[in-house]
């Protein structure tokens, strides 16, 4: 009986994703992305492709690049 219980516990742990995954807003309006395990921060970067327009890029990343605003909690890059 103990062996069966131990086996069930091990199978449950293996089958469940016990790791925390971050969620970030994406560039597409109202979309949410579940980040990969190695992507630990959400980013937001404003890009000006034309003098009269601006695009805000959003998503998951592993490190914060130059000109990006980064944060490490769910949906923090709004």
UniProtKB/Swiss-Prot annotation:
Disulphide bridges, residue numbers: 24-42, 35-60, 64-70, 71-76
One GO CC term on file: extracellular region
Keywords: Disulfide bond, Neurotoxin, Postsynaptic neurotoxin, Secreted, Signal, Toxin
Keyword Ribonucleoprotein attributed: no
Molecular function (Gene Ontology), one example: toxin activity
Keyword set includes Acetylation: no
Extent of the signal sequence: 1-21
Localization, UniProt: Secreted
Broad class of where this protein is predominantly found: secreted
Domain of life: Eukaryota
Organ and tissue specificity: Expressed by the venom gland.
Family matches, as Gene3D superfamilies: CD59
InterPro entries (UniProt xref): Snake_3FTx (IPR003571), Snake_toxin-like_sf (IPR045860)
Similarity section: Belongs to the three-finger toxin family. Short-chain subfamily. Orphan group XVIII sub-subfamily.
Function field: Blocks both the muscle-twitch response to nerve stimulation and the response to exogenous acetylcholine.
Record's protein name: Neurotoxin 3FTx-LK
